[in-house]
A protein has these predicted regions:
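N-terminal, polar/Ser/Thr-rich
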Residues: 17-58, 85, 129-133, 154
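Hydrophobic h-region of N-terminal signal peptides that target proteins for export
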Residues: 10-17
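Positively charged n-region of N-terminal signal peptides that target proteins for export
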Residues: 1-4
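Surface-exposed, acidic/Ser/Thr-rich flexible loop segments
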Residues: 108-171
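A surface-exposed beta-strand-loop module
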Residues: 78-135, 185-186
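Surface-exposed beta-strand/loop patches in extracellular or lumenal glycoproteins
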Residues: 60-81, 152, 159-167
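Catalytic Zn2+-binding segment of zinc metalloproteases
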Residues: 314-329
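Hydrophobic helix-coil surface modules that form long, contiguous segments used
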Residues: 59, 153-311, 330
Length: 331
């Protein structure tokens, strides 16, 4: 009997230690633990993006949330500890522990009700996909935490507001609508974007760089295409088709689901060398440019693939973005 009591005690201690010392990644245990007492999450993000890709980005995030109890709060940040700057609550620096890619804020700093944690950090370059003239994020399925501290699990949706300081000749796009654009220091400008509706961390995205834009308005909705295409004939040949396919998909899905497009604005970005055919970020779909900018006299299959890709990514705005799976195994 003593033997079994000892084993039971050891298991309890192990579980307790597991909660206090999170392992690498986001375990289902950690995800369920956070989801049970944290809600109403808001990320107010700021990044400064230097034109020289040899210079690191600087970042800051205000994470607002409601806590139903005083408990340790564990954020995900898959970087090294020296990439974390100040951690501030109520105007004061707070002590924290950095464990296996997590930032643990002790429960003594957490209030029942509203909380706000401000963190300064340096993002990892891996998920920023930087080149000399542009960069873009790709955070699926669980890579948001390589760019900024967050609760990186799909069922903890949050509101995102973004501010970017970028070179003055660059353009930028994200999930939310652009609100203001003001000159900053010499050679830079600040773009402030409106807050999104609640979305999962893997769906947050932005792109910035030397892009050109084309906009069209149909059915009282304006779509904007960001691109880097230099072949004017190819651009002219494909542009109207791409807009028609997006508008057609939006209209069909609205009629099919009975739900209007749920995310306000919708832009799409054609990116050279993008890793996937497309990625369905709400408000800012990213595509591999070669899949949509077709050469002269495309085959029937190429046209069908072009239309299928757009329909696929637009359908995700309802199936995946509006209604989202609970866990990573369904991403």
């Amino acid at each position: 009997m003593k033997k079994y009591c000892f084993i039971l005690l050891a298991c309890i201690v192990a579980v307790s230690c597991g909660e206090k010392t999170p392992r690498e990644g986001v375990s289902l245990q950690l995800a369920n633990q956070r989801k049970a007492f944290i809600s109403n999450i808001e990320y107010n993000l700021y990044f400064r993006i230097p034109e020289n890709r040899q210079e690191s980005l600087r970042g800051r995030v205000d994470i607002g949330f409601i806590s139903s109890k005083k408990a340790n709060v564990i954020l995900d940040f898959r970087a090294s500890e020296d990439m974390i700057g100040d951690v501030i609550m109520d105007g004061n620096r707070v002590e924290y522990r950095f464990i296996n890619g997590h930032i643990l804020i002790p429960g003594k700093y957490i209030s029942v009700g509203e909380n706000c944690i401000t963190l300064e950090f340096t993002p990892c370059d891996g998920s920023l996909n930087r080149s000399d003239e542009f960069l873009y994020t790709l955070l699926v399925p669980d890579r948001a935490s390589t760019v900024f501290p967050c609760f990186d699990q799909p069922d903890m949706k949050a509101v995102f507001a973004l501010t970017l300081d970028i070179p003055e000749s660059w353009k930028a796009v994200t999930n939310g609508m652009d609100e203001t654009c003001q000159p900053q220091t010499e050679g830079e400008k600040r773009m402030v974007f409106k807050a999104t509706q609640p979305i999962s961390t893997y769906l947050f995205a932005f792109a910035a760089g030397k892009f050109e834009t084309v906009s069209q308005t149909h059915h009282e909705r304006t779509l904007t295409m960001f691109h880097r295409e230099t072949d004017k004939e190819k651009l002219e040949r494909n542009t109207d088709v791409l807009f028609q396919l997006h508008y057609g998909a939006l209209q069909w899905l609205k009629e099919y689901t009975g739900i209007p497009y749920p995310f306000g604005k919708l832009d799409f970005v054609l990116i050279p060398g993008f890793q996937y055919s497309g990625m369905e970020h709400p408000g800012a779909i990213f595509y591999n440019d070669s899949r949509l900018m077709l050469d002269k006299n495309p085959s029937v299959n190429e046209r069908l693939n072009q239309a299928n890709l757009i329909a696929h990514e637009v359908s995700h705005q309802w199936f995946g973005n509006l209604v989202t799976m609970q866990w990573f195994n369904d991403v």
